[in-house]
Amino acid sequence: MEKMELQKQVLLSYSVVYPDRHDKIEDLLANVPSNTAIELISYNLSKKVNQFIGEHDFDIWTPWIMKTRNDVKNPVGEYAQQYNLGNYALIDKYAMLLLISRLLTCYNGRNEELTEDDLSNLFLAYMLCCDERLAMNEKLPNNNMKAEEFVESYMPGCLKSNNIEAPRDYRLLMIKCYMLLIEFPKFNTRFAKYVDEFCKERDIPSAKYYLDEIFLTFMKMEEEDFSNCRMAIDENQKDACRFYDSLTLNPSHYQHDMDFLMMKEKPLIKTGPNIYNFMFMKMFLDKAYTGLLFDMKDALVKRGVLDPTMGYANLRSFLGEEFSERFFFYSLMKKCFGLNYVNYSGEELEKALGKGMPDYYLRRRNRIFVFECKDVQMAAKIKLSGDYETIKKQFLRSMSQIPRGMRKGVAVGKYDWQTFYFRRNGHFAGYFDHLVLSLKVCKPIF
């Protein structure tokens, strides 16, 4: 592995550019047209996410700052004469989301074009959000730290914005939804019944029709501009409207928090009749799959197939084990490694060797790779605690939950080449997958 070097970048913020100002963010945003402002900020945020290597934040930042009042842009110019802004981060994703969240807390539902004063106040509010963002960095890592020190310093702060910084790809979401609604029912009669009842309740011909309605509409949004966050849907597309309505936030009930929980739950906002704005595309991609499950749960409850109280929990639990950890994971591994590796699924291992096997087994030449697939969610209060020991303890506890008769995360670390051979009545009966006796390289992977 190549030697890597940690690089740090400075974020420009309100306190260094406007040391003599004392603006309050709620006063700055009180009269800014909320819908128009949210559309602008979410678009700039999308452009930041879609930046190419070599592009700089100037491309997003400059058109904005040039439309502000002199009392806003002149101090920036004076600061730029002293320091090279090319070394600064000018657009921060977390700070942009903070600004959207603040706009939602003082939402006024207005759609007028933004004036010079509006853009000025919006920029000042963003710079205040950059101060909030910087306050989250309690301890900065450096290149001289040992591995454990680096993790202890870096991970707590990194986790706070991990959902925002981690990459997402809508094409992967489409594949997962296709596997769920089209392929999985072919192998699972229980879920095939669920899909059939779902389609009947929605009065649609097939699951494929449903996917086409949702994802083709979504893809059309990006035909003209890949960073576009605004989508208009024809009122006759009832299923698409119903699906996106289920993911649309009601600003009158919004409460701000540093983890954006309500925005994650409802990542869209309506800025007009059948006009939807994706506040942050990554949040939508995280939520769309879960939103589809809520959609299905509601339909199945209406038809008496699922219990109204525990319907979603039961559906999620069933799909987590039968679809995510087995069918989808097995299919993914088989298609990625099936030609060049000896491979066996967890079910095949259990049939041959009994309970307590990993979820997947690969071998290439003299190397074994054993996989544990686990979908772990960490509570926001743990993730945002900033305490390394608290986070570490919760992570180890989550990875040691008991699935199918073994302690996951504990047992997987103890696998070695001798684990995979047959025993009959306690006696050696031949190595699983015909391993040679000298093979001793085994790598557990979560």
Each language-model region and where it sits:
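Long amphipathic alpha-helical coiled-coil/heptad-repeat bundle
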Residues: M1-M219
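Interfaces and regulatory segments of ATP-dependent nucleotide/adenylate/phosphodiester-chemistry enzymes
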Residues: L122-F337
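Polybasic (Lys/Arg-rich)
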Residues: P267, I275, L437-F446
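A short acidic/basic microdomain associated with nuclease active sites
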Residues: M333-R363
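Flexible loop/turn segments at secondary-structure boundaries
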Residues: K351-G356, Q377-A380, V441-I445
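Beta-sheet entry/capping signal
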Residues: D359, N366-V370, D433-L435, P444
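Active-site beta-strand-loop-beta-strand hairpin of nuclease catalytic cores
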Residues: L362-K383
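Catalytic cores of nucleic-acid endonucleases
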Residues: M378-H434
